[in-house]
């Protein structure tokens, strides 16, 4: 199977999971990125079962609306049973690196209020140690250089994310992103807490304190379901 085929496979598997485990009339939390898009496309077939969705980005909102799925502001929702999103990397504990699509802050906010985080990914995203994929940090623009120095002191290589024309990439929240290369993150929870404590950091793309509860992993042999303790 190609990577795109695996993404569609797990997108459908996530829709099936929602149908089986989330009651009709609920609101679904939806992530951002190419794999999350496959879930949205599969969810569209059963959209009449659910009130709608909470979106983690402008791009996801547009895709949901294009399928006729109602989008709620998180402030309108009292509870969220499930959040479905992809990952750039996921380890054996369910900790993830996320934010390759630039939506890490809103993804983390929506994930934090969901009862269950379902990660959907192809098998290449499963790693023994996080860090081969550059770690995104969303930063207030004026703190960019100071945070870069802190990252360098920890052994990382900070790279400002830019657009095709070389301008800084701007998030939906009006901030910038530093992508940190060269890390081996052996203590994801501790590293997440450390970076989040730096002034000027909006959030880091480590999802360890609130990791995945379940991963639907696309493999050449089908979908592997991994349940994480705790």
Curated annotation (Swiss-Prot):
Pathway as given in its UniProt record: Carbohydrate degradation; pentose phosphate pathway; D-ribose 5-phosphate from D-ribulose 5-phosphate (non-oxidative stage): step 1/1
Keyword Isomerase carried by entry: yes
Cellular component GO terms held in the UniProt record: cytosol
Record key words, sorted: Isomerase
Gene Ontology MF annotations: ribose-5-phosphate isomerase activity
Residues binding substrate, per UniProt: 32-35, 85-88, 98-101, 125
Keyword Isomerase among record annotations: yes
Catalytic residues (UniProt): 107
One of the protein's GO biological processes: pentose-phosphate shunt, non-oxidative branch
EC assignment: 5.3.1.6
Catalytic activity annotation: aldehydo-D-ribose 5-phosphate = D-ribulose 5-phosphate
Function: Catalyzes the reversible conversion of ribose-5-phosphate to ribulose 5-phosphate.
Family label: Belongs to the ribose 5-phosphate isomerase family.
Cited NCBIfam families: PRK00702.1, rpiA
Subunit record text: Homodimer.
Protein name per its UniProtKB record: Ribose-5-phosphate isomerase A
Gene encoding the protein: rpiA
């Amino acid at each position: 199977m190609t990577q795109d085929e695996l993404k569609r496979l797990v997108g459908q598997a996530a829709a099936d999971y929602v149908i089986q485990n989330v009651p009709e009339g609920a609101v679904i939390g939806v992530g951002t990125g190419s794999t999350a898009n496959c879930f949205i496309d599969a969810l569209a077939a059963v959209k009449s079962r659910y009130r709608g969705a909470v979106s983690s980005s402008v791009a996801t909102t547009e895709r949901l609306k294009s399928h006729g799925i109602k989008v709620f502001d998180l402030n309108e929702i009292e509870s969220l049973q499930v959040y479905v999103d992809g990952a750039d990397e996921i380890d054996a504990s369910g900790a993830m690196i996320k934010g390759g699509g630039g939506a890490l802050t809103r993804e983390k906010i929506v994930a934090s209020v969901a009862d269950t985080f379902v990660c959907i990914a192809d098998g290449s995203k499963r790693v023994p140690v996080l860090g081969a994929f550059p770690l995104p940090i969303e930063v207030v623009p004026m703190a960019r250089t100071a945070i870069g120095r802190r990252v360098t002191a920890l052994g990382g290589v900070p790279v400002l994310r830019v657009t095709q024309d070389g301008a800084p990439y701007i998030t939906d929240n009006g901030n910038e992103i530093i992508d940190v290369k060269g890390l081996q993150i052996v203590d994801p929870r501790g590293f997440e807490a450390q970076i989040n404590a730096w002034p000027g950091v909006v959030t880091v793309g480590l999802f360890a304190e609130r990791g995945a509860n379940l991963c639907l992993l696309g493999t050449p042999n089908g979908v592997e379901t991994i349940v994480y303790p705790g």
